[in-house]
Amino acid sequence: MDSGGASDPSRQVRVRFLTKLPAPLRAPPTSIAVPADLTRMGLSEIVNSLLLAASPDHQAQPFDFLVDGELVRLPLQEFLLAKGISVERVLELEYVKAVAPRKQEDPCPHDDWVSAVDGSNPSFVLTGCYDGLARIWRDASECTHILEGHSDGITSARFINKGETEDRLHVVTASKDRSLRLFKFDTSVSVPKQIGAYKILRGHTSSVQSVAVDPSTNMICSGSWDNSIKLWSVEGSEEDGDTVSVKKRRTNSDSSGPEESLFEGSATSTFLGHTQCVSAVTWPERQTIYSASWDHSVRQWDVQTGKETWNMVSGKALNCLDCGGESSSLIAAGGSDPVLRVWDPRKPGTLAPIFQFSSHKSWISACKWHPSSWFHLVSSSFDGKVMLWDLRTAWPLASVESHKDKVLCADWWKGDSVISGGADSKLCIASGIEIV
């Protein structure tokens, strides 16, 4: 191969631009010569100029470029040299819309650290806070309901039903007070704004750190600092438990903490095996639960038998876990170092991660796969940053720096936005992310 000089500004490479984008964004497929030292920004300028020549109304936008399925993140000739591709061939460059936020929305202030977010509902965002309250935000801007009752900080919160066609929302929250609470309410009714739980779930002997909902939305599972995973029924009759009186969270105007009556439920199953805090759980398939722990392990559980069916030791205490990729077959996890790792449990005989992303500068606090893309993930870190990733490159697609302190949680919302919460007591929203 003719290596040439990677920094030689006179060297050129012949390229052909291809895309799967709709017709208005398709450049002519003829090959052209471009400078070999171009980066993706320079390549974007060329594509935009070609599109503008064909359509004067075209609005310039950034693109990313793939060669043989891998995103180009180096100057063109350096990339070719690294991959052993001849500079003499006509290089086919597939271009896609660049994945990066176009807008930072106004943050939503809270009274304490925002420790949990859920963006699985297209109309509402759910947040959990260290003030013991969960909040429902319409369009991530207006707080419509406050879910109260916990006596200590909320650590995790999830929508149970996604609410796409229903007026009623169903929510579960987990707390340092060792309990979980279930809420139901009508989103079309704004009064009362403060909502109490209809059911309290008790059984953990230490702080509940994580919660996940099964695909049928009939069950939930929780992970705790007592090292156990418990399964709970979302519904239930009074024959399954007792009605109890509990003191409501004290407020400044009512120091007595008035009592409320609600139904109490107990766990249907308990899974044992972890030796430290179960920091994250996910329930991707009806019969399979994955868990991550400060004991450095990721474990797979059979829901019916309660038995561990697979485990992997990462070497680091883990804070977060999610399943994604094709058929939700990949596992992403992060913890007490700056590296987000991805494993494929289908590969026998190896526990090495198949991808490692190492651009954060501190511990990873959360990771979530995009709901409709096999390739894209979001991560948050104690370094104050939220990063967007694509499996096809080791470099982050974008780094969002909306927070002024540690970021504790992050999620996708509506497919084109990222929501995050942190120690600066804010819910932040980065929007306009185009993933095709």
UniProtKB/Swiss-Prot annotation:
It is found in: Nucleus, Nucleolus; Nucleus, Nucleoplasm. GO terms for cellular component: nucleolus; nucleoplasm; preribosome, large subunit precursor. Coiled coil: none annotated. The keyword Coiled coil does not apply. It comes from the Eukaryota. One of its GO terms (molecular function) is ribonucleoprotein complex binding. Residues 13-97 are annotated as: Ubiquitin-like (UBL) domain. WD repeats lie at residues 109-147, 149-193, 203-242, 273-311, 313-353, 359-399, 402-436. Residues 240-262 are annotated as: Disordered. SMART domains: WD40. Keywords: Nucleus, Repeat, Ribosome biogenesis, rRNA processing, WD repeat. One of its GO terms (biological process) is maturation of 5.8S rRNA from tricistronic rRNA transcript (SSU-rRNA, 5.8S rRNA, LSU-rRNA). Required for maturation of ribosomal RNAs and formation of the large ribosomal subunit. HAMAP family: WDR12. Belongs to the WD repeat WDR12/YTM1 family. This is Ribosome biogenesis protein WDR12 homolog.
